[in-house]
Structures are given as C-alpha cells and as structure tokens.
UniProtKB/Swiss-Prot annotation:
Belongs to the INCENP family. Residues 60-69, 261-270 have a biased composition (Basic residues). It is found in: Nucleus; Chromosome; Chromosome, Centromere; Cytoplasm, Cytoskeleton, Spindle. The IN box mediates interaction with aurkb/aurora-B. Residues 87-105, 314-325 have a biased composition (Low complexity). The keyword DNA repair does not apply. Keywords: Cell cycle, Cell division, Centromere, Chromosome, Chromosome partition, Cytoplasm, Cytoskeleton, Kinetochore, Microtubule, Mitosis, Nucleus, Phosphoprotein. It comes from the Eukaryota. Residues 286-297, 491-535, 566-584, 591-649, 683-733 have a biased composition (Basic and acidic residues). One of its GO terms (cellular component) is meiotic spindle midzone. This is Inner centromere protein A.
C-alpha cells in the first residue's frame, strides 16, 4: 500500500512539474520566439513598396539653428516661418492660399482643443478614486458627415498602396451603407468615434493604445507635424496606461511645458490593478515602436529643413513657380484616405462597441504608432479634395476624375523634369532615343518642377537607392518617363564628351557622399542604440523604485487595516459573527471530512483494484521473463557448442597449416643444401678447370720457350757457319793475291786474319725469362695508358676469387657478418693536438702574415683575383 501511495504522489509531482514547465514556455519563451519570428518575417519579406524615409541630415543641416514653432500657431502669423526674401511677390499667391487653409483648420480645431485642460494636475490617491467614481460615461454624438472629420483633422499622408486599399474600403462601405438600415441614436452614442480604426479585434491590436492617428506634416515647409489622439474621455484601463507609459520612454521633443506635463502624467498614472511585467514593458514590440517614432521624427525634421531651403531658392523662376505652386496647393489640399479614417457611418457599423467611449485631443508632438503597409489593391486610387468635403457631399465621379487628372499631371511633370544631377541616370536607364531629333521647342513651353519638388524627388530617389537589395534592382530602380522630351539633341561631340566627364565626376562625388553619409548614419544609429539602452535601463530603475515605494505604501496600508480590524474584533457583534462563521465552518469542515472520507474509500478501493491488476501483470511479466530466460539459455548453449566446434576446426586448420609450414621449411632447407652442394661442386670443378688451364698454359709457355731457344741456337749456328765460310773465302783471296804479288815490302795485317778468329771467344748470352713465383703478383704497370690495357681482352688472366660464385659468396658473407676491424687492426686512438703542435715559440701564437685582404677569399672569386690585388708580398 505504501508503494502505491508513493507512486501516485510521484505521478502528481511529475504532472505539476510538467504543467509549470509548459506554463513557463507559453508565458516567457514563446513570446520571445513569436517576436523574433515576426521580425525575421519582416526582414525576409520586405518588398520595398512602402514610402522611403527621407535622407538623414548632413552636418551642415545639423549646425543650423532649429526654429521651434508653437503647437498652436498664431492665426495672424505667417505659418511659413521663413524670412521675407527680396522677391516675395513670386510665391505670395501660394502662401496666401496656405494661410487661409491653415486658419480654417485652426478654427475648426478650437472647440476640440478647449476640451483639453490647460495643465495636468498632480493627483493624489483619494482624488484619483473620487474622479473614477464621479466621472460619468460621456455620450458623444457622431458628426453628421465625414466632411467635418476631415475639416477637424490635419492632413494624413499615406502611401500609394494604402490609398488603393482605402479606395477599395470606400467602395465596400458605400455598398454596406445602402443595404444596412440607419442606426439609432442609442447605438450611435455607444459606438467609437470616427478616428477609431476599423480593424478586427486581435491580441496584437488590443495590446496597443486604441485610436491613435498619425497626423504628419503638410507639404508647406513651415507647419510642424502633430500627432492627435482621438480617444474617449473616460478613464483608461490599466493595461492601456501601462502600454502608453512604455511607449513614452523615448525623449520628448516638444516644449518645456509639454515635458513638464509628461512628467506629471507619469507621476499621476499609477496602476489601479497589478502592473504589467518587465517582459511586456521592455519587449521587442515597444522597442520597435520607439525606433519607429525616432525615425519618423528625424524624417519630418529633415523634410521641413529641405523644403525651407528649397523655397528660398524658388524665387528665381516666377512664372514656373506660379504654375507649380497652384498644382502643389491642389495636391496639398487633397485628403488621402486610409481604411482607418473611412466615413463615420462605416466605422460605426463595422467597429464593435468600445469599452468606454471618450474623445480627447492630445497636442503633444510626434505621438503615434507604426501602421503596417497594406496590400496593393487592383482598384485605381481615388482622392477626396477639400472643396468636396466643404460641400458636405460624397465625391462624385467628375470631381474625382478632375483630382486624378490634376495629380497625375503634376506627378508626370515632376517625374519628367528631374534635376540635372539625376538626368544621366535616367538617360542610362531609358531606352535609346531615336536618331532623328524631335522638332525644336521654344524654352517658354518647357515646364520644370519647382525647386522644392526637385529636392524632394532627389531625396526620395537617393532613399530608394539606399534601400535597394540585389533582388529589387530590376523592379524598383528603373523609373520610366511618360513624357516625350521636347528639348532638341545637341550633336557637338566635344560638348557631349565634356558633359559625360562632368556627369562621371558628379556621379563619383555622389557615391563618395553617399558612402560618407552611410558611415555617419551607422555611427548615429550605434549612438542612438546606446542612448536608448541607457534610457531604458534608467526607466527600468525608475519603475522598480516606484514599485518598491508602492509596495511600502501598500504594506503600511495593510498594517493600518490590521490595526483597525483588531480594534473591531473587540466588539460583541464581531464575536457573534465570528461564532456564526465558526459554526458554519465546522459544518463545512464536517461535510468536507465526510466527502474526503468517501473519496478516500473510493480511492482505496481503486488502489486495491489497481494493486491486484499490477500483481497480475507482474506475474504474467515474470512468466514471460522465465520463458525468455529459458530460450536465452538454450540459445546460449547452442552458441557455446557452435563456438567449440568452430574452435576445434580452427585448431585442426592451424595444425595442418603448421605441418605444411614445417614440411615447406624442410623442403626449403633440402633445396638450399642441394644448391650449396651443387654450388660447391661447381666451384671445385671451376677450380679444377682453372688449375688445368693454368697447367696447360704453363706447359704451353715452356714448350714455346724451348722452341724459341732451339730456334735461337739454330740461328746462331747458321750465322757462325756463314761467318766461317766468309772468312775462308777472304783468306783464299788474300792468299791468291799474295802469291801473285812480290814477297818483299808486304805488310800483313794480323788482326783480321782468320786464324785469330777461328772460334768465338765470349759468345753473347741470351736472357731466359724468369718464371713467376707469386701468382697473385700481376706486375700491374704504373702507366695504365698503354694499348694493351683493355678490359674486354686483359693481358693477364683474372683470378678465380675475383669473379663468379666465390665473389658473390664473399660479398654476402661480408654483408651479413662484417669484419671486426678493431679486433684485426686494433682501436685507433684520437690524435692529441698537444703532441702534434708541441712548439712553444711565441711567434707561433701570433699572426705574422703581412697579407692585406681587399675582399674575402671566397672560392667563387678566388680564381679570377689578381695576385697584386689580392695579396701583398
């Protein structure tokens, strides 16, 4: 039983831990993951169809003094806010038209502005509670027609795609107005004001402040942009106040009074319920909204400064500026309608009933929310002009078509007449012109846009170039011209070359300026992010300190209430109530105990059944395990028998292999022995053959020597016979001469007489060649360049040990068994330098050479150095 309880407790703990983990995932991690996914989707799905932001300020624009205009400008003051130029008559008509439109707008807004109190008061807790109790729900009647809304509100600038979607929304709302009956006054009083956006109620839309509308700056460069919050006047819920507080973390940009009112409003707004968590206050959504606000502020300030500078330059062309100012005024008066600002009847029919309807006008500057881009509609855009709104009538097709023509005409003219800086890029992108020039056009007919339009279009095109990606170049960068150029083509090649060089230089300057601006912008962004992080940290610390103060106040309040409760408990009535409560509690506890006991019995019965089931399952499990063990044992025995059989086979195979190896070794040894015996026999036979050859050679030499001696002896004998015969013949001749000559006075030469030389006194000895005693002494001559030194035909026979198998055996034996040289010849001692150089004269330790080295005696340059140059003797 104890094990079953432990098991159930363990299951409960696991279930609780799992629920906590899932709750943590849903409340913390999934929020961050969803926001990261949203940011990634925005990054990868941006199509660059939205209106580009204006270019950032240059350093020269930053150094200019900012002109602060009041939130409620004086109606007698010129709203342009620029200096009176020397030629003010050119733009007087356009400025007067703008002044009249601004005065009408201010008169229409006077009533709504007076509803806002002049200054926010510091509210105590009691005053806040009293105001919550006493403030009634105000009923605000809707305006009679959408023209009143358009008159009260400032101009709303939207993009072209939002204009198309608004047109489609207007068509749908007109169709619904025809089908749906009129709404009663009671329902009208409960609906939201016309400024509330008609969007479906989603968690994302609930999290934002309801009914904020972005009122951007008008086209006149002197007006300052405002954000008007058209919400209801009843007190806000706590979550909306907290969201507004997180949105106001950015630095206010209004006047000092506005900043003071912001601080007081931060002090006044204390949450009546629990505060939002820090994750919701410092989430990516609030950071994204604050970054959007900063970007819009920057773009509005830059557009105002650029338009101011452009209006000062615009006084040069009087007629062109007159015509363009008419067109620009018409464009400025045009009201661009979003789906959020459709007529009040459509809003009241489609929007759900608001929590507490209220309507207030907040004049703090640049307070807004980012509105996402709406998808393009296939319907053509339609505009409602201010003249149509003043007539309290729906826009007729004729007026709409006129407004479209005016707008299209000025747009085409502005696109066609770009500034000179942008013209080369347009010529490169446009298709090649015709070879035949167009007919000449007088300069008076050439219409150019006003300078402020030039600078605006130039800025927009630069922004488009900055925001381009490689995939969007083919779609967005090519701007096609819809108007045929009327200026004649110049065919002067020198002028064209100069123009091309000037345009190349200008393009290079623009690229360098663009890179510099990008670097400056990156530095600005990095500094702004650092400032934003510091500001958020500071705000978080302030909020934490405020929460701590509130906690201390709540603890004090709880202590006071506890004291009052202790005092009240002393009374009799409290005691009676307590006794009654105790009786009721006892009844409830008894009832609960009975229920617990019944539940315990049921649980005990269920536990008992569960234990029985578990025991049955355990028994079946044990039986299965026993069967499995038996099967495993059989399988193991089979495996062991198989392993033994395989081992026996392996052992037999190894024995056979060993026997085969031994037999192969014995066979190999036998073959080697036979080879050695055969080699020895061959060596002996070769030695015998050599010895026999040597003996035959010696015998042959002896025979040749004997034959040579015999021939020499025979030759000498023949020579001796020939000499003897010669002498005998001479002697006979002399005897004959002597016999014939007289005997007296005859001198006889005794020296040449044959009697004296009858035999050889000392015969010449012949040198017999000595026989070699040492066969290894071949008597190799020192000069080996004689004609008999031929390796193919040596003069002397090669010994047996220097060729054949004996040489191979000797080399093999010397390789495997090298000769111990130290044992044969003894160890060689290292030489002692003292014994070699034992002279002690001091001059041997000096360098006494008188040589002068002009260059180092290297081996590379030693052979070509002259003696007189290298050494002195």
């Amino acid at each position: 039983m104890n094990d079953a309880e432990c098991l159930s407790h363990l299951l409960q703990v696991c279930a609780r831990k799992t629920e906590e983990f899932v709750r943590t995932l849903d409340s913390k991690h999934m929020v961050w993951l969803l926001e990261i996914e949203e940011e990634a989707r925005k990054m990868f799905s941006s199509d660059f169809n939205a209106e580009p932001e204006l270019m950032p300020k240059t350093p020269s624009q930053k150094r200019r003094r900012k002109k602060r205009t009041s939130i409620l400008p004086d109606e007698n003051r010129d709203p342009s806010g620029r200096r009176i130029s020397r030629r003010q008559s050119n733009a007087s008509w356009s400025s007067s038209v703008r002044r009249l439109s601004v005065r009408n707008q201010n008169k229409a807004n006077d009533d709504s502005i007076q509803e806002e109190p002049a200054q926010l008061k510091r509210m105590t807790r009691a005053r806040a509670q009293a105001s919550i109790k006493s403030t009634p729900v105000l009923e605000t009647a809707l305006p009679e027609s959408p023209s009143q809304i358009c008159q009260k509100n400032a101009q709303v600038k939207i993009s072209e795609q939002e204009r198309r979607s608004a047109e489609q929304k207007l068509i749908e709302s007109d169709f619904e107005l025809k089908t749906v009956p009129e709404i009663t006054k009671d329902n009208v009083s409960e609906t939201v004001n016309s400024a509330v956006p008609a969007v479906p109620v989603t968690p994302e839309n609930k999290s934002r402040a309801a009914g904020k509308l972005k009122i951007a700056a008008s086209s006149t460069p002197e007006q300052k942009a405002e954000m008007v919050d058209l919400t209801c006047e009843s007190p806000r819920p706590a979550n909306e106040q907290q969201l507004n507080l997180s949105n106001q973390s950015a630095t206010p940009t209004g006047s000092k009074s506005d900043r003071r009112s912001v601080r007081r409003s931060l002090v006044v707004r204390k949450s009546s319920s629990r505060r939002a968590s820090l994750a919701s206050q410092f989430s990516l959504a609030s950071k994204r909204e604050s970054m959007t606000r900063e970007a819009v502020r920057k773009s509005i300030r830059q557009s105002i400064s650029q338009k101011k500078a452009a209006m000062e330059i615009s006084s040069t062309s009087s007629q062109r500026s007159y015509q363009s100012s008419i067109e620009m005024v018409d464009d400025e008066i045009t009201i661009k309608i979003r789906p959020e600002t459709v007529p009040s009847e459509t809003v009241s029919e489609e929007a759900p009933a608001a929590e507490s309807p209220r309507r207030s006008l907040r004049s703090r500057a640049f307070k807004k929310i980012a509105i996402s881009n709406l998808p393009d509609s296939e319907e053509p855009p339609r505009k409602v002009t201010r003249q149509m709104v003043a007539g309290n009538a729906e826009p007729t097709p004729e007026t709409t078509e006129d407004a479209q023509n005016i707008r299209r005409k000025s747009y085409k003219r502005a696109v066609d007449e770009l500034s000179d800086d942008e013209r080369p890029s347009e010529e490169e992108r446009s298709p090649p012109r015709k070879k035949t020039p167009s007919p000449p056009c007088p300069p008076s007919k050439i219409v150019r846009p006003p300078p402020h339009m030039k600078s605006f279009l130039h800025t927009v095109q630069k922004n488009q170039l900055l925001m381009m990606t490689p995939g969007s170049i083919g779609k967005n960068i090519i701007m096609k011209s819809f108007i045929k150029r009327n200026t004649p083509l110049k065919t002067d090649p020198k002028t064209e070359e100069k123009e091309r060089q000037r345009l190349d230089a200008l393009r290079k300057k623009e690229e360098a300026e663009l890179q510099r601006k990008q670097k400056i912008e990156e530095g600005k962004k990095r500094k702004q992010e650092e400032l934003k992080v510091r500001r958020e940290e500071r705000l978080r610390k302030v909020l934490q300190a405020r929460e701590r103060v509130e906690q201390l106040e709540e603890e004090k309040k709880k202590k006071i209430e506890q004291k009052f409760a202790q005092i009240d408990e002393k009374s009799e009535k409290v005691r009676e109530d307590r006794m009654a409560e105790e009786k009721a509690k006892k009844k409830m506890t008894a009832k609960k105990q009975e229920e617990v006991e019944c539940r315990r019995k049921q649980e005990e019965e269920a536990r008992r059944l569960k234990v029985k089931q578990m025991e049955e399952e355990e028994r079946r499990h044990q039986e299965l395990l026993q069967k499995k063990r038996e099967e495993e044992e059989l399988e193991r025995q089979k495996k062991i028998a198989e392993a033994k059989r395989l081992a026996e086979q392996e052992r037999e195979r190894q024995l056979l292999a060993e026997k085969e190896r031994l037999r192969a070794e014995r066979e190999k040894e036998r073959i080697e022995k036979e080879k050695a015996l055969q080699l020895q026999r061959e060596l002996e036979r070769a030695a015998q053959e050599k010895e026999q050859q040597r003996r035959e050679a010696e015998e042959r030499k002896k025979r040749e020597q004997q034959e040579r001696l015999e021939q020499e002896r025979l030759r000498k004998e023949q020579e001796a016979k020939r000499l003897q015969e010669e002498e005998q013949r001479k002697a006979k001749e002399q005897a004959a001469v002597a016999a014939s000559a007289p005997v007296m006075n005859v001198t006889v030469d005794m020296q040449n007489s044959p009697a004296c030389e009858s035999y050889e006194m000392t015969p010449k000895s012949c040198k017999v060649p000595s026989v070699k005693v040492n066969e290894d002494n071949y008597g190799m001559d020192l000069n080996s360049d004689d004609s008999t030194d031929d390796e193919s035909q040596p003069r002397k026979p090669i010994p047996a040990w220097a060729s054949g198998n004996l040489l191979t055996q000797a080399i093999r034996q010397q390789y495997y068994k090298p000769i111990d040289v130290d044992r044969m010849y003894g160890t060689i001692d290292s030489p002692k330098l003292e014994e070699l150089f034992n002279k002690s004269k001091p001059r041997y330790f000096k360098r006494t050479s008188s040589a002068v080295w002009h260059s180092p005696p290297l081996s590379s340059n030693r052979h070509h150095l002259a003696v007189g140059y290298g050494l002195k003797y």
